[in-house]
């Protein structure tokens, strides 16, 4: 899981209750030690300006890169809760893999550092809200506006998948716009953080941190099985349902109940909530939320389908709806 805030973003897009801010230059685990920790690992390069979010394993800061004179976002991560001595090495591997993702719809990673107990990641600062904030404040996005935006998000996922990188926490809060305009560039954030946090968590902690993401977990992820790119695509289908309808496919207060629904329940059809949506879009969402991972469209297929819908919503879709399960299946 990620912290409550995505890796980068605008303070106006905060969804948590943390509103503490600072404008002091550099004093990452706790708030008081964040400046000193980052300063020691970066030779004073980064100056913290404002804390814009906090969660169970870290904080998100707006900062200034004093070397390149640019605004950046810094996420600090607390590794001290892990008893596994390999946590630091895993973080380094995740940071390297994420930094290797070069795509206009993936947040750009500039730098990272770790000292065994705390770590930080430096990335581009995004001035827009995340999709969850937009849906919460404004309601669902009209499908005509959402389709081209969603195609870009799927393109970012496809780029990562081709390099063997799985996001593991695809949800509206982890898609941030580059500006306040809905037509601005959407960028995926928090690659690898979900895996890092899950590997640290006890069973109880894992259950508690699932509250924010259970609504977007694939059935195999909810069951604790190994996940791959197909898991991200199921989560993307859930994200599409939220963006287009204003709520996830299986809303609920209990993460355990929601996770169980992901495994066993049939997702609602898109047009049961958005009657004017084209059948091709409904079929795509249903196919993405197929319980069988191998039956889901890939990111590349999803991009093609969304682009086709954007070009001609009334044309036959590129993705067929899932076939009903037969007796005994």
Model region roles, listed by residue range:
Residues 48-55, 60:
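Protein kinase glycine-rich loop
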Residues 76-100:
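AlphaC helix of the eukaryotic protein kinase fold
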Residues 82-86, 178-226, 253:
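Activation segment of protein kinases
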Residues 112:
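Activation-segment/catalytic-loop signature of the eukaryotic protein kinase fold
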Residues 116-130, 134:
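Conserved short submotifs of the Hanks-type protein kinase catalytic core
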Residues 149-150:
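Activation segment signature within eukaryotic-like protein kinase domains
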Residues 154-165:
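Protein kinase catalytic-loop region centered on the HRD/HxD motif
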Residues 215-315:
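C-terminal lobe helix-coil module of Hanks-type protein kinase domains
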């Amino acid at each position: 899981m990620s912290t409550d805030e995505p890796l980068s973003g605008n303070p106006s897009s905060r969804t948590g209750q943390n509103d503490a801010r600072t404008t002091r230059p550099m004093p990452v685990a706790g708030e008081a030690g964040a400046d000193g920790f980052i300063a020691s690992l970066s030779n004073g390069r980064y100056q913290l300006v404002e804390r814009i979010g906090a969660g169970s394993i870290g904080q998100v800061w707006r900062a200034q890169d004093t070397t390149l004179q640019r605004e950046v976002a810094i996420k600090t991560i607390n590794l001290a809760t892990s008893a596994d001595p390999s946590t630091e090495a895993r973080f380094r591997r995740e940071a390297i893999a994420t930094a290797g993702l070069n795509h206009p719809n993936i947040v750009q990673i500039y730098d990272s550092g770790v000292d065994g107990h705390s770590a930080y990641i430096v990335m581009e600062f995004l001035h827009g809200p995340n999709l969850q904030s937009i849906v919460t404040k404004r309601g669902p996005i009209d499908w005509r506006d959402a389709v081209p935006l969603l195609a870009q998000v799927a393109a970012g996922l496809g780029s990562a998948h081709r390099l063997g990188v799985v996001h593991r926490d695809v949800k509206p809060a982890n898609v941030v716009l580059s500006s306040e305009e809905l037509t601005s560039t959407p960028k995926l954030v928090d690659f690898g953080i979900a895996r890092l946090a899950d590997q640290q968590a006890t069973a109880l902690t894992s259950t508690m941190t699932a509250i924010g993401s259970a609504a977007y977990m694939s059935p195999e992820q909810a069951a604790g099985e190994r996940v791959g790119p197909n898991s991200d695509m199921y989560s993307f289908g859930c994200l599409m349902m939220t963006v287009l309808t204003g709520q996830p496919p299986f809303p609920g207060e209990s993460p355990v109940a929601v996770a169980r629904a992901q495994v066993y329940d049939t997702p609602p059809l898109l047009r049961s909530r958005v009657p004017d949506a084209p059948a091709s879009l409904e079929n795509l969402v249903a196919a993405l939320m197929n319980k069988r991972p191998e039956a889901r469209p890939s990111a590349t297929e999803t991009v093609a389908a969304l682009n086709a819908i954007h070009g001609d919503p009334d044309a036959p879709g590129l993705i067929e709806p899932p076939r009903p399960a037969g007796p005994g299946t």
